[in-house]
Swiss-Prot record:
PROSITE patterns in the record: TOPO_IIB (PS52041)
Protein name in the entry: Type 2 DNA topoisomerase 6 subunit A
InterPro entries reported for this sequence: Spo11/TopoVI_A (IPR002815), Spo11/TopoVI_A_N (IPR013049), Spo11/TopoVI_A_sf (IPR036078), Topo_VI_alpha (IPR049333), TopoVI_A (IPR004085), TOPRIM_Topo6A/Spo11 (IPR034136), WH-like_DNA-bd_sf (IPR036388)
Annotated catalysed reactions: ATP-dependent breakage, passage and rejoining of double-stranded DNA
Keywords: ATP-binding, DNA-binding, Isomerase, Magnesium, Metal-binding, Nucleotide-binding, Topoisomerase
Gene expressing this chain: top6A
Record-stated family: Belongs to the TOP6A family.
Source organism (scientific name): Sulfurisphaera tokodaii (strain DSM 16993 / JCM 10545 / NBRC 100140 / 7)
Amino acid sequence: MSSELTSKVDKEARKKAADTLRQVFVKLIEQINNSEPPTMEIPKRTLGNTIYDEKRKLLLLGEEKLKRSFFDLNESKRFMQTVLMASIIYDALINDEYPTIRDLYYRGKHSIILKDPRGKTYEENTWDEQKESDSVIMDIEVFTSLLREDMLILSKEKGKVVGDMRIRSGNDIIDLSKMGHGAYSIEPTPDLIDFVDINAEFVLVVEKDAVFQQLHRAGFWKQYKAILVTSAGQPDRATRRFVRRLNEELKLPVYILTDADPYGWYIYSVFRIGSISLSYESERLATPNAKFLGVSMTDIFGDSNKKPYLSEQERRNYIIKAKDADIKRATEIKNYQWFKTKAWQHEIEIFLNKKSKLEIEAMASKGLKFLAFQYIPEKIKSKDYIE
């Protein structure tokens, strides 16, 4: 790629990542020059080494580390994979390339053929499946404290955003209020986006892309001065980071709207406190003060303090019976430390008692105007959300 076409922020990010990779991995050469076994100490990416920081409301990686030595037969292949992947990423950085995680898998996949002193031939693949190379990339992230986005490694775009906002991406200014019926796809390197100007009072993140499209076409974000985002299901890293930046840098409150079921709750928790599998990223990806707007169990059934939004007839029409997997997942979530607040325990208890769930679309079935101009704004105004 011509350097003239590369933005200044891209060049700076590329240089920073390349310098960091070089500084970290050159230590292996120093160990060899000192006649020491080349060894890496990498933080463990395990459930047992994941902690919930009650004060910061984040899932974080603990302090346990594993030693990966080239001379340890149990670790030598993983050592080789780590060094190989780091070299491929480094080459891409210094050559102005933007590889995808799939590209990296193919670039590194080959067979290593060796002969022992007796002439016997051995053949070993660098990796067989992409999940192997993906895991190695994660190891490099925790080893270097560089996220793959920092290393300009691309992934498929998933999240979308629309609103009264201008951003700079590369050398272009993009107006997110002029997307027609479409929306801006959140790029896989959201830290390279500059916020130019914005006219909004809050961020609404919607789990379902279909509901996002309905709210967009209804003009919800225009009427209520909102930045409207969809994660299109489980959020990818880019969407989580983009939402975090909107909250942290622009001080916009964040509200999450999901289905009323355990999977919707978990999507909310991933946005708010991070995920167990990627706890090492939570400090940069999670939004600890994000609020669960709904759809809540009390929205459906009400309680002693609140009337339901659905009538008895509407409940019969829209409610879905929870499956065994839903019950099991709810029971698991109930025991997570970050769900042990009074409000969340109340929410989960209603679900387990009623054994019922509801999709966001049910609220739209009462009428799109009800969802966009009554349900959502009423809940925000009355602070009817769970934290």
